[in-house]
Amino acid sequence: ILLQKVQLPLGATCIDVGTGAGFPGMVLALLRPDLQVTLLDSLQKRIGFLEQTAAKLGLANVRCIHARAEDGAKLPELREQFDMATARAVAAMPVLTEYCLPFVKQGGVFAAMKGPSETAEQAETAAKLLGGEIVGEESYTLPTAGERKLIRIRKTAPTPQKYPRRSDKIKKQ
């Protein structure tokens, strides 16, 4: 559903924030070898596993980075560099939007794959503050996991430099 709802040009850049075991980032790299996919995770052990997996699968289009989202989004080589950022169960939508939208360049999309109780409306204030606008919310069903949602936010303006904040500051709101 992700590649159906987010049309990415040839050679597009993607970052999977809080990738965990590499889903959906590794799958995107397999399905679209033209994409340049960055897998970002805060646990070095996971990054090591993903590097080995990408090497065994011959995925030259995968780069693995060990960093927390709020730190990685401050790095010039990652900030506002991606056509698409994606994430799954990292945090609630307002927090996840603050973590992910700073990675997306203007005109790009943040695509959140969330559970059935999450809504685009929950991220609307954060999206506006961070230079984005809600462009879609679709429900879909996974055979073994039930109903899910894909929430899409288009980046329309640069994210102010103070974002993302440290996780303890974000979660206090």
Predicted segments, located by residue:
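Helix-to-beta-strand junctions that scaffold the AdoMet/dcAdoMet cofactor pocket
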Residues: 32, 104-106
